[in-house]
Amino acid sequence: MSKTYHFIGIKGSGMSALALMLHQMGHNVQGSDVDKYYFTQRGLEQAGVTILPFSPNNISEDLEIIAGNAFRPDNNEELAYVIEKGYHFKRYHEFLGDFMRQFTSLGVAGAHGKTSTTGLLAHVLKNITDTSFLIGDGTGRGSANANYFVFEADEYERHFMPYHPEYSIITNIDFDHPDYFTGLEDVFNAFNDYAKQVQKGLFIYGEDSKLHEITSKAPIYYYGFEDSNDFIAKDITRTVNGSDFKVFYNQEEIGQFHVPAYGKHNILNATAVIANLYIMGIDMALVAEHLKTFSGVKRRFTEKIIDDTVIIDDFAHHPTEIIATLDAARQKYPSKEIVAIFQPHTFTRTIALLDDFAHALSQADSVYLAQIYGSAREVDNGEVKVEDLAAKIVKHSDLVTVENVSPLLNHDNAVYVFMGAGDIQLYERSFEELLANLTKNTQ
């Protein structure tokens, strides 16, 4: 009889992806979480995975229990019950570290761009050969016959340390998660420790001098735009249809590629994927063919059009990510006003990066701010308010609420870019409803 996996916190992006993957491999899967809607639960519901409210009644000794990394006995009754009874359980990252040993594994790490790059690598490889994958947008695919496993490696609290992949990409490093990391050097040390566990090939963005300090027992290949790299993206053309470029390895052209994505960061992400697959011996013609059909990942520059109004939803919640997202919007919509609607995520990050957020958001033409979304791990002690950020932004800025997003209507020929890692989608939904009601009233 097949074992049943129970996920404590199944709506988490990594947890939901892992649950879907195990479900597709034929295992019995269930999980528990809060009632509040989260975008990952749609895939779980479509797959028929049972989602329960948190309760000790969900727990029995015969379950294989996987606990989300954020949960502790003092904030989750199920985990408290598991520990009280002495039942065996694994944290998400511990389970994943053991699970991936049955495959040739390809990890994607980095402060920014992990999910998009993991999604692109998984998309290309699964269209060439049977591949399992786990992406941080809540998407997972499991196949018992797969030789390869593509996964996202998260640096927060050094969760990627149980992983020993054959290959890994490191897109960049940056100071983030100030509730855990003490500074950039601490972040670097975490990535350096992870890099030492990579077995066959490490692919690193080559235009960050700090990344050149990373060491690994695996061969290191640098990628980027400059000629000093091993893999170089050249002859770049950025249009409203995406980006075209050639990639050179050791000064020899290995292919011409098109990726239907926007922003310089997505050219770099694609170059990293190309480099990894080239070193693995994958046919570059096949790689080029399947790069063209990549449709993106959830909450990464996700677009919709409502009555000729363009709305973009993006997970960007760090200044570097905001700049990249706004750059992508300008590439695709060069003649439109770029309106940013941003919700800061966590008080600790907002305090630590306040000036950087102001600089990044000033790349938009107009800015609207939502109230700071606090993490369950922290308390609002009044040290920072969203008004503090608004005061530092040089462009026009204003505050909006879920109940009143009408100030957004004060723009013509605009693209609305909603960004954040909290519940910014509630603001987006309110704006969509407002647009729909306006359309009805004018018909």
Swiss-Prot record:
Keyword Cell cycle appears in the UniProt entry: yes
Gene Ontology MF annotations: ATP binding; UDP-N-acetylmuramate-L-alanine ligase activity
Main location per the UniProt record: cytoplasm
Pathway(s) the chain acts in: Cell wall biogenesis; peptidoglycan biosynthesis
GO biological process, one term: regulation of cell shape
Keywords: ATP-binding, Cell cycle, Cell division, Cell shape, Cell wall biogenesis/degradation, Cytoplasm, Ligase, Nucleotide-binding, Peptidoglycan synthesis
Natural source organism: Streptococcus agalactiae serotype III (strain NEM316)
UniProt subcellular location: Cytoplasm
Catalysis performed (reactions): UDP-N-acetyl-alpha-D-muramate + L-alanine + ATP = UDP-N-acetyl-alpha-D-muramoyl-L-alanine + ADP + phosphate + H(+)
Binding, ATP: G110, A111, H112, G113, K114, T115, S116
Annotated GO CC locations: cytoplasm
Pfam families according to UniProt: Mur_ligase, Mur_ligase_C, Mur_ligase_M
UniProt-recorded name of the protein: UDP-N-acetylmuramate--L-alanine ligase
Role according to the record: Cell wall formation.
HAMAP family the UniProt entry points to: MurC
